Amino acid sequence: MTSLSSSAAAARATFVMPSSVRGGMSRGRRMARLVTRAAASSPKLPSGRRLRVAVVGGGPAGGAAAEALAKGGVETVLIERKLDNCKPCGGAIPLCMVSEFDLPLDLVDRKVRKMKMISPSNVAVDIGGTLAPHEYIGMVRREVLDAYLRSRAEGAGAEVVNGLFLRYEAPKEPNGSYVVHYNHYDSSNGKAGGEKRTFEVDAIVGADGANSRVAKDMGAGDYEYAIAFQERVKIPDDKMKYYEERAEMYVGDDVSPDFYGWVFPKCDHVAVGTGTVTHKPDIKKFQAATRLRAKDRIEGGKIIRVEAHPIPEHPRPKRVAGRVTLVGDAAGYVTKCSGEGIYFAAKSGRMCAEAIVAGSANGTRMVEESDLRRYLAEFDRLYWPTYKVLDVLQKVFYRSNAAREAFVEMCADDYVQRMTFDSYLYKRVVPGNPLDDIKLAVNTIGSLVRATALRREMEKVTL
């Protein structure tokens, strides 16, 4: 990638994208574009050039954003620090993501149709009986999914750069350029630490995860985060058969005081992990407890990889500043209670990119902060209720072992399972049957009353 002059005036006049970008963009412009309309106040870009956007981070959010930008006629550079990154992620994706993002089925390692919820006292409830034959939860490996989405973005015309984003300089005048500083990694030049380079863009999409440097630069504010710890375990074939279409979730103070432990199937191994917000120093103790709870089914297995990573607990206080915005984990789009983030990352990346394409009239006009705020407003309208409901569920049912027992008891109800899977698989809230809703409310209250009584009895025994 060509290093550009640090002189703002000169660089604005002589900005040159890498030849691979120019060639790629001509391919991208031949692809189908969104028909968009920019605001009348948006200034036209100088003749002969298009809107330039840097996407920082090459996970689901960054890959989806870069592809949509390139298809929409925007000159796009995606910067990813580690192209073979394996993230400690359960890897679950909803069924709607497969069709919505046109994912090939061979990307899905396992189709989970059975879920076992296991309470603190090891009471197990099987979930999945309400699923239709074609319905499943997809299990993917992040290193495979992320690489696929990046390659698709590259095919659409985006330039994928192996490098570490360092910081950005904000423009000194209206409609001026942002200067992106990064370390460019190239094994051929013999510089293991990378070569410092800069380039200019009109907008920046921060998709660089929970520890986002873009968020830090824009003053996005801090948030609570969980630490996720996961081991990939290669287990004997006869034990792997048990997990062919099954995943397990363990709840209890032993595996996590505020989250859950899991055993999720991958292509030829299982992922065993847990997470916590409140007791991060004890994460390895919780992981050992998760392994112990699953001992009978993973015994004889060999740990082939150990992973740890922060997971945001709620959206950041600020997600847009000028022509810089955040998507995915960088924005804090991970749901409480379930810890789901892949779909919301990809969805936010695409929605953000579509807002930029629309606001810039397919890359022919300067984008404005108001365009980016439209993406935020639409994302919040669609998904904010989901975040709030799961936040409440976590506070109610994860507060004690007695409450977790009540939670697992509720999961045995077919109506609960049907409503839960509908909302998860299709990311929609389907109106329920009023009579069933009343029954569910009564059962929930009953479960919580029993949980409270159980907690008091447990406290007496402890005393």
Curated annotation (Swiss-Prot):
Catalyzes the reduction of geranylgeranyl diphosphate to phytyl diphosphate, providing phytol for both tocopherol and chlorophyll synthesis. GO terms for molecular function: FAD binding; geranylgeranyl diphosphate reductase activity; geranylgeranyl reductase activity. GO terms for biological process: chlorophyll biosynthetic process; photosynthesis; vitamin E biosynthetic process. It comes from Oryza sativa subsp. japonica. This is Geranylgeranyl diphosphate reductase, chloroplastic. It is found in: Plastid, Chloroplast. Pathway: Porphyrin-containing compound metabolism; chlorophyll biosynthesis; Cofactor biosynthesis; tocopherol biosynthesis. Pfam families: FAD_binding_3 (PF01494). PANTHER family: GERANYLGERANYL DIPHOSPHATE REDUCTASE, GERANYLGERANYL DIPHOSPHATE REDUCTASE, CHLOROPLASTIC. Belongs to the geranylgeranyl reductase family. ChlP subfamily. Coiled coil: none annotated. It catalyses: phytyl diphosphate + 3 NADP(+) = geranylgeranyl diphosphate + 3 NADPH + 3 H(+). One of its GO terms (cellular component) is chloroplast. Gene3D superfamilies: FAD/NAD(P)-binding domain. It comes from the Eukaryota. Keywords: Chlorophyll biosynthesis, Chloroplast, NADP, Oxidoreductase, Photosynthesis, Plastid, Transit peptide. Its EC number is 1.3.1.83. Residues 1-37 form a transit peptide. Disulfide bonds: none annotated. It is an enzyme of class 1 (oxidoreductase). Its main location: plastid.
